[in-house]
């Protein structure tokens, strides 16, 4: 997701060459408010409350299989959301959902076409959004060989790589608010976590309220992005290091984000 057309010199070097094609990002805040961020202007182009949902939206993501934006609410109801109007249409009702009051991670596995739901309490679910069937996978825990072995995970965001239709392989990365770092969850179904590295966010930013997504070009290239406060950061998937890229006007309290499919196969 090389998404900004104009950056500081250091950020431009980091993010690489830009193209003429902007990308839109859906950013979730409050209970069910979506802001559409235009990556060309670096501003919010429209903001609306999701129309037709009952309850707090846990998280959002684009499903690679159909390129539609999905939202999951607290009672487990799954909706598709029209990004032009904000109108929600019920898709299914999950037979099990996350523990009330926990921070939620919602992201589609592009290979299995299943929705991963993770709670900050360690609950780890895998859902078929077509029929609502849910598999309870292994509770999150750090690997026996990890430096954080025995500690309680506090995952507040996560995303899969290669998030495109027809992907043959993928990997799941999480953000842990307690250690302020990037984790790799492998295998995702087992819930086994391995620390990649510290994000190194500014101390003024609240790592408990962040949004995280990974852009993929369909050719094996992945770029991870994290929103904290009103700053978008690039995240190195090899080291966990988060680097401020640009400040976004008109957003605050963003707790989930989804990179929307654009007219071109590849954003900037």
Which sequence ranges carry the predicted segments?
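Gram-negative bacterial Sec-dependent N-terminal signal peptides
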Residues: 1-22
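An edge-strand/N-cap motif at the start of beta-rich repeat modules
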Residues: 21-39
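Conserved beta-propeller blade signature
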Residues: 24-28, 68-71, 114-117, 167, ...
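Loop/turn residues immediately N-terminal
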Residues: 31-35, 75-79, 121-124, 178-181, ...
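Short loop/turn segments that connect beta-strands within beta-propeller blades
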Residues: 39-42, 82-86, 128-132, 187-190, ...
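A short beta-strand motif characteristic of beta-propeller blades
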Residues: 43-52, 87-97, 136-148, 192-204, ...
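Structural signature of eukaryotic scaffold interfaces centered on beta-propeller domains
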Residues: 58-67, 97-113, 150-168, 205-220, ...
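Blade-level signature of beta-propeller repeat domains, shared across WD40, Kelch, NHL, RCC1
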Residues: 237, 242-267
